[in-house]
Regions:
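Short alpha-helical patches at coil-to-helix transitions and adjacent helical residues
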Residues: 17-24, 56, 114, 163-167, ...
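Hydrophobic single-pass membrane-insertion segments
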Residues: 317-323
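Glycine/serine-rich anion-binding loops at beta->alpha junctions
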Residues: 6-23, 216-234
Length: 323
């Protein structure tokens, strides 16, 4: 099996979930196993929990498996159901900007935050037994238990509870095409991720700060697991090229690091590629690090599974079947 990918590793663009989901689709085809996109996402999440020992949520696997072209996905992590939210207005674009400061989730930072959120629920339940998860709590309830939680657990809970509401508010703003409001929510989200959940970095904060001063930018925030990686910007399509130039220039001046930016749009999740799609895959296939012509490899194999992530980075998983 040859794996060809241009999803940046450690960029917060679901590189691990992309691999998990696409390999699952490949195995389903080989073994003739029928699986719903939702079940596939849950299976791959379990693989990351049990074999990579990373207590990740379901978001990355869910969008990689269930994503639809032209739509965002509002995920209910209790019912494991998704609601499509149209995002195909040509007047707005999404820019992904990679800080090229790779995030690291192999330490205790992520598991620590999972535990802190669980601790917050336990503390809340002493007074509010109806709270089964932080999504059930209100800001007022969290504030009332601030002393019992302590500063760190309080701020973690405050972020999660407020972020749940921001997700719902952002959905309404996007449906109404109120991009100014959606952008404000992105900025608020980033501030909370920075100050309350503490998963941002100086480089990421620099990118968001630069973006916030550019004409045509509605909003920006860190994306992915945090501790490095990428930001996403919601921008006026007419201004997209100018915004990218400003980000690249000013980020290099401020940090000495070159960032990588591209315009993207929501795309379909993992699927088996049809014969007529092969030419598109060949055109998009990158050259691997050893400089060998991967496009020749892609042309030579008869079995295809492709995955397009929400960041519009595309992974191609190809397998040469022996006769």
């Amino acid at each position: 099996m040859a794996i060809v990918s241009d999803v940046p590793l450690g960029g917060g663009l679901s590189s691990s979930a992309s691999l998990e989901i696409a390999v699952s689709v490949l195995l389903e085809q080989l073994l003739k196993v029928e699986m719903t996109p939702e079940d596939r996402a849950l299976l791959c999440q379990a693989a990351e929990h049990n074999f990579a020992h990373m207590p990740c949520g379901i978001m990355d696997q869910f969008i990689s498996s269930c994503g639809q072209k032209g739509s965002l996905l509002l995920i209910d992590c209790r019912s494991n159901k998704g609601e499509l939210v149209s995002m195909n207005d040509p007047s707005v674009s999404i820019i992904v900007c990679n800080s090229n400061n790779k995030h690291q989730l192999t330490g205790s930072e992520y598991p620590d935050r999972v535990k802190q959120c669980k601790d917050a629920v336990t503390i809340l339940q002493a007074k509010y037994p109806e709270v089964k998860a932080l999504r059930d709590a209100t800001i007022e309830q969290v504030e009332s238990m601030k002393e019992e939680m302590g500063d760190v657990v309080y701020r973690r809970a405050l972020h999660v509870v407020s972020e749940c509401q921001r997700c719902l508010d952002c959905k309404e703003a996007l449906v109404a095409k109120d991009y100014k409001r959606a952008g404000q929510l992105l900025y608020q989200s980033h501030e909370s991720l920075k100050n309350n959940f503490e998963v941002s970095t100086p480089e990421i904060d620099t990118l968001v700060e630069i973006a916030s001063h550019q004409d045509g930018v509605y909003g920006a925030r860190i994306t992915g697991g945090g501790f490095g990686g990428c930001i996403v910007c919601l921008v006026d399509s007419v201004k997209a090229d100018e915004v990218i130039k400003a980000l690249e220039k000013q980020y290099k001046e401020k940090t000495g690091i070159e960032c990588t930016c591209f315009v993207t749009s929501p795309s379909q999740g993992a699927r088996v590629l049809k014969a007529y799609e092969v030419d598109e895959v060949v055109k998009a296939a990158p050259t691997c690090e050893c400089k060998c012509p991967m496009k020749k490899l892609v042309k030579s194999v008869p079995f295809w599974v492709g995955l397009a992530t929400t960041a519009a980075a595309v992974s191609y998983f190809v397998m040469r079947r022996k006769n």
